């Protein structure tokens, strides 16, 4: 029977015990009326405000670390009505590092009652989550002026754990004002000085500073430091305007009104313009003193000196300028060449000298602008020379030239006719026609060729002994010297030596009457066929 009664009472006892333990634990861990702060070094300051009036004579706070073998106790003293405070000194020195960021403290409030000591409250305290540093101290004025002042301070008992997270606030007030009207300055970095500006000269001020560590869950500002009083210097008697912006404003307004006054004077005074012009003109140098020839030539007109010597229409061509005639290049063995030679032989008269004639044209710039591979050459004379099929009689013992044999080489010109330009040496010299044609606009503007009188060649052309050598001779050969000039004959009229003839030996030849060349017309194949219908091709 006793066993049955115990079996149903045991669960009831356990339930009541659990409820009592939960109630006691809630009462112990309730720290809303106990506020403690750690100064990051060796001090924990606590403030206890009991929830109900207690009939006690004294109370203490006991601190125990979960990682260290010491217990610390401080006595609570009343600071105001229903408030008790004390400071737990954890280390032997105020600057000793007694706790770390992983330490936990168990704080208990114990009070003495009539029957003995009773534990009133117990809570767990995280030191680095509840930081409140000591107020800054040692405020001093570093530099002071009439409107500016530099003040510094110091902080102490700050752990190296929180030193990089410090921020400051400073407030300034006039000596006869309250702190509620003070100006607050925030310093978001670890700066232990402040530079005050826009102060009033010869005025007294007070300054206070506080610090906070931006670390942990609960961040609390330190108490304000002791106020430091200072006085600015009196103003200099020369300073008439106390505000800098007012001085700048007056300067700008003065310049503006001065400019308007000058404009009005220049507009209203008519005689001032010529006088000012005369005054400024005296400092301008007269160019006629340095350019006397131009001054006398243009009558002292400077604009005429600088203007163009020709009108603007001079640079715009109004009509098409005459051009040089196109050149006809004929093959010596072609049918057209044979027809031309036959027609010339039929209509020409013998030349007094017995040699062919050549027409010379002065071409200035044609080859420079129209030849793709032309070098930079000066203006020169271009000779257009041909020989209308001269036949020479040779001695009985000598060989006779065939009818289709090439023309003998030309002799160099004499006198002043040899001052033509030397072109780059080439193996393919062209036959140039001296005929003049109508200007062709496809070539662009060019200089009109200047026709010169026909040149007379000396008599006595040596004949070539071998037809093979004649086959190698070009129909038109222009012999040039080493210096680029043509070789000239002697003035006595002697026979000029030809290199080809010197190789074969000189023989006496008789020159047939040479056709008189018409240098003003060069008949084309169509014109020849129109004149002589018996030689149509």
Curated annotation (Swiss-Prot):
Instruction: Quote one Gene Ontology molecular function term.
Output: cytokine receptor activity
Could you tell me the membrane topology recorded for this protein? Single-pass type I membrane protein
State one Pfam family annotation.
IL2RB_N1
The lineage's top-level taxon is Eukaryota
Q: Which residues lie on this side of the membrane: Extracellular?
A: 27-239
Residue ranges of domain Fibronectin type-III in the record? 135-235
Task: Give the matching Gene3D superfamilies.
Answer: Immunoglobulins
Q: What keywords appear on the UniProt entry? A: Cell membrane, Disulfide bond, Glycoprotein, Membrane, Receptor, Signal, Transmembrane, Transmembrane helix
Glycosylated sites? 43, 55, 71, 150
Briefly state the protein's biological role.
Receptor for interleukin-2. This beta subunit is involved in receptor mediated endocytosis and transduces the mitogenic signals of IL2. Probably in association with IL15RA, involved in the stimulation of neutrophil phagocytosis by IL15.
Task: Read off the domain note.
Answer: The WSXWS motif appears to be necessary for proper protein folding and thereby efficient intracellular transport and cell-surface receptor binding. The box 1 motif is required for JAK interaction and/or activation.
Q: Under what name is this protein listed?
A: Interleukin-2 receptor subunit beta
Look up and give the organism this protein is from: Rattus norvegicus
Task: Give the classification, highest ranks.
Answer: Eukaryota, Metazoa, Chordata, Craniata, Vertebrata
Q: Which gene encodes it?
A: Il2rb
